[in-house]
Amino acid sequence: MRTSQFPLNTLKEIPSDAEIVSHQLMLRAGLIRKLAAGLYTWLPLGLKVLRRVERVVREEMDRAGALEVLMPVVQPAELWQESGRWEQYGPELARLHDRHDRAFCLGPTHEEIITDLARNELKSYRQLPVNFYQIQTKFRDEIRPRFGVMRAREFVMKDAYSFHLDQESLAQTYDAMYVAYSNIFSRLGLRFRPVLADTGAIGGSHSHEFHVLADSGEDAIAFSTVSDYAANVEQAEALAPTAPRPAPTAALLKVETPGKKSIAEVSEFLGVPPHQILKTVAVMQTIVDDDGLDRDMFVTVLLRGDHELNEVKLGKVLGRFRFASEDEIERHMGCRPGYIGPLNLPAGTAVGPVYADRAVAVMSDFVCGANEAGYHFSGVNWERDLPLPQDEYLCDLRNVVEGDPSPDGLGTLRIARGIEVGHIFQLGTKYSAALNATVLNEEGRSQVMLMGCYGIGVSRVVAAAIEQNHDERGIVWPEALAPFQVALCPINMQTSARVRTTAERLYAELSAAGFEVLYDDRKVRPGVMFADMELIGIPHRIVISERGLDSGALEYKGRRDADNQSIGIDGVIEFLRERSESR
């Protein structure tokens, strides 16, 4: 393709509303343009990259035996009401009415639609297992769309849904999708990790996320230094300490800590490391009373000062909960936040159950709030000064940290940042039971089908790839994602017939050899030409100049290379093939 036929819509300046690198570079390189908040038009260059992702996804899904369908973006409210999600979904579900005042929504996901299709089309166990997939536009009315296509309101997604008669069949398809996803991200040239994950709002019993590794990633993932274990930090188990609790050595003291409320402030003021401070978090647990009505119960949660509360883990212990307000804390503890603790509770305070992370059990000579403004206790010890919570209240409630033992017993954990680009679930019967999606089993009896759900954020993959592959000059595409493989850059071709003739011949030969070439036939300075090609990230650049032709050579530079090199004109095709295959 010639640049005279394929205009480059590059920008010199970084748009002011672009916060992260991928958003900045997608705009500057001319991949996308913003239409409205969270809505983007894909320009020709960006669409070429998007189509490359789609092609690899489609090939691997087909190879895994999945069947492609295409479902409507607009979905009737009745199906969402039948599943119960019409009321459960928040304002991110965009709802609308047609001219007959019938309610619809713009699909953020397609569980209801595919389950309705399955219950109407699948009648017998002989039709199972089956796995349907689509590559389709989704819409979620995010309250604050950010980061370009990374968190847009409208996005392209591959979603697949499988149907099964038994758990063994579901597990087999789940494993096949795990392999297919690994193949997809490997073929795209991305560094990634599959990790154990929480099933979240989608539901189900088993789940893995696929993360592209990038320092800018929003998610923290934990992985073993020795084994293949990897999990989202929300899911990774923090093992119970194996060392015994040290014996007390310090006397219990009430110490003045004026204005020192945070762990960091108390640590610095008392000269005590954060892991020697007991942190008390107050929450309101939703429980059902004898009349079947919801009510709040005040609960305190204890953690080591250097550990973070894992809200997902706490939710699995308590069910529904929210963090207590300052007024609620004062009403129940007799003290404002910053000084609360499990020791020296004022008489008559209505403190509910006390839960503690397992690491708390081996603390000794620690510091905790004194339930009095401006004071803490030091030298606190379990059993001597206050009872340790019973075993049923000692739980894994924290995020793992670097250096923790791996939950599989092999090595220690490291923490990396990742961008979630894929998620697979074993859904079970959550949707099939709600929509009565059944088939006749071998005995001729009606049986609810088991379901699996498998998603890839196709447009998000493009942004994630840039977050992982860029430098100060622009995008550094993996070979499989680049919009073009080769940039052909003739210098002063308008004034040099020899350069122009050589460029035309090379363009024809490279194209015939199967390379996708961007032939820069613009009348621009070499510096502008090179800067644009580096910005848009083409892996291989060939420069044709009078000086090079005098010695029978071309100038080559790989996008990831630091230096240029000379190559013979006659061997350019074989050279590029070797370079492409080695990456």
Swiss-Prot record:
Domain-level remarks: Consists of three domains: the N-terminal catalytic domain, the editing domain and the C-terminal anticodon-binding domain.
Top-level taxon: Bacteria
EC class (word): ligase
InterPro entries on file: aa-tRNA-synt_IIb, aa-tRNA-synth_II, aa-tRNA-synth_II/BPL/LPL, Anticodon-bd, Anticodon-bd_dom_sf, Pro-tRNA-ligase_IIa, Pro-tRNA-synth_IIa_bac-type, Pro-tRNA-Synthase_IIa_type1
Family: Belongs to the class-II aminoacyl-tRNA synthetase family. ProS type 1 subfamily.
Subunit: Homodimer.
Described purpose of this protein according to its UniProt entry: Catalyzes the attachment of proline to tRNA(Pro) in a two-step reaction: proline is first activated by ATP to form Pro-AMP and then transferred to the acceptor end of tRNA(Pro). As ProRS can inadvertently accommodate and process non-cognate amino acids such as alanine and cysteine, to avoid such errors it has two additional distinct editing activities against alanine. One activity is designated as 'pretransfer' editing and involves the tRNA(Pro)-independent hydrolysis of activated Ala-AMP.
One matching Pfam family: tRNA_edit
Main location as per UniProt: cytoplasm
Transmembrane in keyword set: no
Keyword Cytoplasm annotated: yes
Annotated GO biological process: prolyl-tRNA aminoacylation
Enzyme Commission code(s) on record: 6.1.1.15
Matches recorded under CDD domains: ProRS-INS, ProRS_anticodon_short, ProRS_core_prok
Catalytic activity reported: tRNA(Pro) + L-proline + ATP = L-prolyl-tRNA(Pro) + AMP + diphosphate
HAMAP family noted in UniProt: Pro_tRNA_synth_type1
NCBIfam families linked to this entry: PRK09194.1, proS_fam_II
Any one GO cellular component localisation term in the record: cytosol
Protein name: Proline--tRNA ligase
Keywords linked to the UniProt accession: Aminoacyl-tRNA synthetase, ATP-binding, Cytoplasm, Ligase, Nucleotide-binding, Protein biosynthesis
Subcellular location: Cytoplasm
